[in-house]
Amino acid sequence: MNTDDLDNFEAEREMQLAQEYQDVVGMFRYAVETDRRFYLANNVDVRVLSEGPRPILEVELNDAWVWDMYRKSRFVPKVKVLSFKDLNVEELPKADI
């Protein structure tokens, strides 16, 4: 497999993932973006584990979908993420649901 084949494979997988996102976004209430991943989830709980210049955040998601083109199954019953970087949690508008 050469570089062009790999680029084409990744582009095709990314397009499939974008289509899957469009198909499933209506099943979820929240969009969650961490420094490493993007998730859709129905329940989100964020806790601050330590304060300071770099606070540690614990994010627990239930009934989630993860944007990851290398996973066979992107539906996950429970996710726990620890982060000390940016975290974005958005409640999806009802019109998008």
Language-model region placement:
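Conserved RNA-binding domains used in RNP assembly and mRNA/RNA metabolism
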Residues: N2-I97
